[in-house]
């Protein structure tokens, strides 16, 4: 099941089109958009396609420009950064092992939650400023215990260790808390995110209960609140 409401229809169509492209057959969807489609916790607007193999940057960039009218903003040895139909698309070689089976849901190839979670921990370790990375870990902990995430992290990135991941999760001085997160359901306060991360580090085997209100629940709650307000404004019975 995919939470398609987390991604604009045009973006979702573009993801499928890119992943059907034979030139991009070695790439898989990762990052926040993959997590949003799997978890349904927030909206996401970017497309991150990663491979664990080298690729010809010049050839792929040229193909994207011709086939998709991509506006390529920059390239690296193993990376392309571009916009397609105003959607930011990053195409990168991430040369670390894919540890779990690649999943295909509704034509979309994605890495496992464990693999993406390990990549999120690595991102926080080296750039702990992005609020959405902490939000994503908060939501992942409703599905996978931190112990499993850090074990995968350490296996994928053998030069780091679990303690480094714990330290990164608990260091928040660089987090840009003013960044806007478009949550699905209720907004999650920063203090609640911090509390969960702290508890997860202490109790690594915990899987946390979801504190989010799903859209259907939210609609039902609003209706109940309106009914309650109407009842509260009735005049006295005579």
Identify the role of each PLM range:
Residues 1-238:
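Compositionally biased terminal segments of proteins
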